[in-house]
Amino acid sequence: MDSSPNKKTYRYPRRSLSLHARDRVSEARKLEELNLNDGLVAAGLQLVGVALEKQGTGSHIYMKQKNFSANDVSSSPMVSEEVNGSEMDFNPKCMPQDASLVERMFDELLKDGTFFWGAAYKNLQNISLRRKWLLICKIRSSNHWGKKKVTSSTTYSTHLATNELAENAHFLDGLVRNLSTGGMKLSKALYKLEKFLRKQSFLQLFLKDEIYLTTLIEKTLPLISKELQFVYLRCFKILMNNPLARIRALHSEPLIRWFTELLTDQNSNLKCQLLSMELLLLLTYVEGSTGCELIWDQLSILFTDWLEWFDKILADDIAIHSSLYLNWNQLKIDYSTTFLLLINSILQGFNNKTALEILNFLKKNNIHNTITFLELAYKDDPNSVVIMEQIKQFKSKESAIFDSMIKTTNDTNSLHPTKDIARIESEPLCLENCLLLKAKDSPVEAPINEIIQSLWKILDSQKPYSESIKLLKLINSLLFYLIDSFQVSTNPSFDETLESAENVDYVFQDSVNKLLDSLQSDEIARRAVTEIDDLNAKISHLNEKLNLVENHDKDHLIAKLDESESLISLKTKEIENLKLQLKATKKRLDQITTHQRLYDQPPSLASSNLSIAGSIIKNNSHGNIIFQNLAKKQQQQQKISLPKRSTSLLKSKRVTSLSSYLTDANNENESQNESEDKSKDSLFQRSTSTINFNIPSMKNITNMQNVSLNSILSELEFSNSLGTQPNYQSSPVLSSVSSSPKLFPRLSSDSLDNGIQLVPEVVKLPQLPPPPPPPPPPPLPQSLLTEAEAKPDGVSCIAAPAPPPLPDLFKTKTCGAVPPPPPPPPLPESLSMNKGPSNHDLVTPPAPPLPNGLLSSSSVSINPTTTDLKPPPTEKRLKQIHWDKVEDIKDTLWEDTFQRQETIKELQTDGIFSQIEDIFKMKSPTKIANKRNAESSIALSSNNGKSSNELKKISFLSRDLAQQFGINLHMFSQLSDMEFVMKVLNCDNDIVQNVNILKFFCKEELVNIPKSMLNKYEPYSQGKDGKAVSDLQRADRIFLELCINLRFYWNARSKSLLTLSTYERDYYDLIFKLQKIDDAISHLNRSPKFKSLMFIITEIGNHMNKRIVKGIKLKSLTKLAFVRSSIDQNVSFLHFIEKVIRIKYPDIYGFVDDLKNIEDLGKISLEHVESECHEFHKKIEDLVTQFQVGKLSKEENLDPRDQIIKKVKFKINRAKTKSELLIGQCKLTLIDLNKLMKYYGEDPKDKESKNEFFQPFIEFLAMFKKCAKENIEKEEMERVYEQRKSLLDMRTSSNKKSNGSDENDGEKVNRDAVDLLISKLREVKKDPEPLRRRKSTKLNEIAINVHEGDVKTRKDEDHVLLERTHAMLNDIQNI
């Protein structure tokens, strides 16, 4: 092995002082002498050392063995004290046999640090023993060159220290002067300073006096040229080992600015930039966060330029810099590593809030692109482990900053998508905030904001939920598709980008169309399956019923038949009993009439006879109870001095409206009785009403016999099932009975309200068969009458007789068929001579219920829960609401009887019914008439107020058609005739996408050409007679080439193209309308609040109306605003409803929000939408037919130049799919609409009702909102008025406590206070005070009289206050 020092080279991995190999100067320093006790310096040096340490074997810089100058070697100290004192011969050719001695000497040489340091210490350990001896010999021989041998090592060291101090002092003497001047002196001074600064003794002397460091920073810095940058930076890197120098450099703003500007200087050497970054990195650890702040303040100014320059460095080719840098790859690795270390150090030096701002600034400058490039470039490089670690650290720091800030903002745990992935399903993440924070101040911030705004518009738009869901699914699918399928390379070429863009465009359009169609078909299929399930459930229910009917055995049917036969026989017997009862009733009536005519006595005698008759009946154990009751009533009636007119039964609501049924039949009978004595008739009427028999008159018996008894039985059964009084409207027999004013007692409403129940007593009587009645008593003598009058006490104990027993027909089955009793004796005349019976004493008991056995199988069955739902009756006359009632409430919302009951209870408990009675009561007719007269008078008073070449060419078209050609084809005027024709035949996008041109091609004049026009163009089309088409004008030429030559299929072609160009727009318009209707239907089906509102409105209306309805139609909602209050004409029934709902039922008030989507349906006609859907379907079917079997089905029938089939064959299938989807959607929507209409009591078969189904909802919502606004404004005005009034009262009370003079001034102020407040409230310039100033003058006079002792002062003041209050109230109402 050649050991010549001139030929051998060394592998030296570290950067040398010189920028080029030929100019390198030896470098040395003593690491063991550095002050490593400073923790900050140690951390910084350790961080830099780790980052720049080489990993494994890599490239090395091969340098010559002659690496140090003579000056460096001559000034080096002794390597070893032991070696210096020995007489060993350091001959390179004669190596000692003791290898351990060579190793020890070489280790001492390395530990000295004068000649080798840093990575050289590690690398030189691996060289051979022979090589180590050569280095020792070279250094030892140089050390003894030209010097005398020192006898003692101590003496030598003393001389060496003395020389070193002298040399340092001599160098410092001229250092300030040399550093302040430029040129060669500055260059020599810097190089020499860099060498001296490696010595600890010189470093202490240099820093002992601040003038040296100040001169180096302030005076030398402006003089630094490009050649001196590296040595200048090396000086500061050595100075950074001292804490005082670090602090001084950190607080020198010009120095820090020079370091940062050097990073962006593209003319400077990269090694200088790398060294500058290392110095900035070291300074970020000084004084905690202060160092980071000072460094970032200067670095942020030039960070954008620096990052761009760094990107250029990473993108440049290696061959470009091979001539300047020996190892370009290693330099890029070192540069990138230091860059990442500096960024991470800055982020770690701030708190999270400031770090977030810095991170957003870095994002804005596209630092993520740079990091992504580094990650891709050095992902598999074994020498770039530090880079990958720093990238990972940057990402983790970024995530930590985002997580901490989001946690602080939202008070939640880790919300960043990259953290806590396992908790995504269990905890909702605030992805929107995280996304915005992550994209803030970056290039992607604007696109992400646009995407979020688009998503917000989708959610906030009026689109139905189904449409919004499809759009969101589409967006999500597209994003996943694009992310997975279109990954763009790191640096794609322009051609690759263009090609990928074209592929994306094609695939994107096709994917979007397919995805939309699949989403729509899925929605329709889902709804169709739901509809099928409902129908299957109904079919299974019907099958169960059918099976139940079929499974009935014959024995069961025979048993039912036997029961029916027994019921028929029983009813036959009952009919016979009724006939016998009619005969008995007729006979009894004759007796009563005869008795009435024979015994015509005065009232006093009749009273005595009644008392005696009552006592006789009382003594008889088998007497009738009716006479006892009559005696009691007679004793009570004697206390009344004047007779009172009783209320007739005909006055009742039921009988009054029903008695007119037989009015015409009874006129003849009534006319025969007009000649009789009126007094007798009145007495007879009172007598019969007192007896309380429901007996028809003799004159009506014949009419009653002609009426079937089944009608009576069915009606009585109906009343019995309802538990109420029988309805006499449906029975002409009962109506005829009730129409007789002489036989029916007068029924008082008070007696009914008092709840006098006679039915139980009457029902119990027939249980024991009564004995035969006693014979009619003779008329009493006059003496007995006088004696009876003299003993009122004895008469008072006689009770009035009870009603007669019921006929056998009305007894229960337990009584059996008992023969009717004999008729009762005729009553004495005195019984009919009562003196004005009271209204409270005359009671007609209701008809007793029929026995269960008499119920007819054909009788009407009514749900008792429905008929019992009545609001409490009211005595006041209220305004009526004209309902459009629903007769059949089955399967409608009105079928919910439970909610109806709850609604009535709540309205009654909250006092809503009482408020209705006060607000909507009927006014008296006189007031209404006066008001109408006043209004009519007011109304009457108010009623009294071409070029020359074109002209030479031939044209057969009409002027109008030629002008239309020019107008519609003006955008293609630059094209020639044939160019335009070929554009049409090629189906160019400019033609196909222009709807106006396609519509023009479909005009009648162009598709249906008359024969006369064909004859004119025939020579040109066939080329006969030598006529050339060039002789025709432009419009005629186009007309000839297209409309005439292609007339066989031109009509079909034009209509097909027009359909294909417009079908998508029409499809989405119709789908949008249908989905709006679906959305409205779903809201109406899912709104329990609106259902509750309907029940409240109905029950309040039932309380006001005379007739109760089970349900109302939707049209009735619009009539609520026409029912005005009797107190204030500005208040309608709808105002009242709105206030009640808002105050009493705030949870129901949200129905307005539930139905807000219905407001948009006012412009949509259901019939029109349905017809458009069918028309669209038919149009697409015709299109498909044309291309399958029509004129456009075969290419040989078309012009060879025509490309229509190739252009539209894919669009036809798509149009057919959309047509089927649309018609399916339309059918499902109509099915749901029919169900909803039936639910609200509407007829789905009525076209008018279907078209206007949503209109009542829209109008009602508009009126309801208007009423709500007016109510709130009125309440606010009243609140302001009450505040002003309370303020006035407080001031008045305070003024009364003051003295007299102050009292006068206070009253004047109070009088003006309200007027001033009113004027401010109305905000008018003209003050309405002069009108009341006159009143104020009078008030002042009254106030003066108060001091004079007037007694009426208080009343006058109250009167004045009342007047002023009314005036203020009028002003507020005018507002």
UniProtKB/Swiss-Prot annotation:
Which GO cellular component does the record give, naming just one? mitotic actomyosin contractile ring
Q: Name one GO biological process term.
A: mitotic actomyosin contractile ring assembly
Anything noted about its domains? Answer: The DAD domain regulates activation via by an autoinhibitory interaction with the GBD/FH3 domain. This autoinhibition is released upon competitive binding of an activated GTPase. The release of DAD allows the FH2 domain to then nucleate and elongate nonbranched actin filaments.
**Per the database record, which ranges form the GBD/FH3 domain?**
94-490
The chain positions of domain FH1 read 659-851
- Write one Gene Ontology MF term: actin filament binding
The misc remark on file is: Present with 259 molecules/cell in log phase SD medium.
UniProt entry keywords in alphabetical sequence = Coiled coil, Phosphoprotein
Q: Does the keyword Repeat apply?
A: no
Please tell me whether the keyword Transport is annotated for this protein: no
Look up and give the organism this protein is from: Saccharomyces cerevisiae (strain ATCC 204508 / S288c) (Baker's yeast)
**Which PROSITE patterns does its entry note?**
DAD, FH2, GBD_FH3
Q: What does this protein do?
A: May organize microtubules by mediating spindle positioning and movement in the budding process. Potential target of the RHO family members.
Instruction: Give start and end of each DAD domain.
Output: 1302-1336
**Residues covered by the FH2 domain:** 868-1290
The family database entries (Pfam families) matched by this protein are listed as: FH2 (PF02181)
Q: From the record, what ranges are coiled-coil? A: 520-601
Q: What is this protein called?
A: BNI1-related protein 1
Q: Could you describe the subunit structure of this protein?
A: Interacts with profilin at the FH1 domain.
Region: Disordered, residue numbers: 661-684, 764-785, 817-839, 1285-1309
Phosphoserine occurs at 621, 751
Regions of biased composition (Pro residues) lie at: 767-781, 818-828
